[in-house]
Amino acid sequence: MITMMYKTVSLLACLLVIGMASCRNFDAKEVKIDSDLTLSGGETEWKKGFELSPLDSTKLSEVIRMYDLGNPDQVITLDKKLKEISGLSFDQKNNQILANNDEDGVIYYLDMEGRIVKEENFGKDGDYEGVERVGDNIVVGRSNGNLYFYDETSAETVKVKTDLKKDNDVEGLALDQQQNLLLLACKGAALSEKKSKREKFIYAYNLKLEVLHEEPFLVMPDAVHLSYVEYHIDDISQKEKEDLQKRVKSFAPSGIAINPINKDLYILSARGSFAVVYSANHDFQDVLFFDEKFLPQPEGICFSRGGDLYVSTEGGKSDGKIVKYSRR
């Protein structure tokens, strides 16, 4: 095992992953970056580090072709109650959209056209940032890491404190059904002070064990996203490329969702209006840039059962909106 400084690891990893993706003899599973910023061999579980692999050009094409981000299929103007919309998720049980804003302790049930069909009060006002269905419970995440389990049958709410705090700044919540985990995307610091500020983190709450795993579920290095823009986005001017890199540098997770079609993980950023995409195996896939005209401050993201993409944006001086991109 060879210990290296973070900058050196990031640079070498990105050159290998991004710049040399076409090298057939390079086996990505032999190189990983773990929580101690070391290079080592062999496979590893997700809790022990973030594994990089060469970008698969076919996979990238699939992601790019799946949605036409420049031409949304529908722009839905929301009720004024959702001007500050934050969390967004698809409710498979009722074929509805669940939403919350970042001020009120209210769960909003929307039809697929964005109309409010029901409201449920689950708690006091607070900075709420994500919503997901887990069985008969609707779970709402708060920026300080607390989870609120609202039982639809009894109309009672149970508050669960995790090890995440205000400094971690939880902004996104998603359900990983296959692993029975709630994923919490953090805009702020890592649980461990040893983690670099040039990375963002997702942590996992185990629903069966009722515990938050200390090691990150996913580590997202800024260097990987920047290298993608540098080496894999062509046919634009240098000024346009620099503008995209500036947007990527502002990466601040604001929402998270799993695509039901290929299980890719989409992590939304309100700053810069884009999303980064990682595979179910935690391999980086893509950066998707939204048109800021439609999504000036994207805060919530979800997918329908058929894979249509829905992204919400706060209203600012106007009303909140949900933008739909149909799966092609």
Regions found by a protein language model. Give the residues of each.
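Bacterial N-terminal signal peptides that target proteins for export
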Residues: 2-10
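Sec-dependent N-terminal signal peptides
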Residues: 9-17
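C-terminal motif of bacterial Sec signal peptides marking the signal peptidase cleavage site
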Residues: 19-22
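Sequence/structural signature of beta-propeller domains
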Residues: 24-328
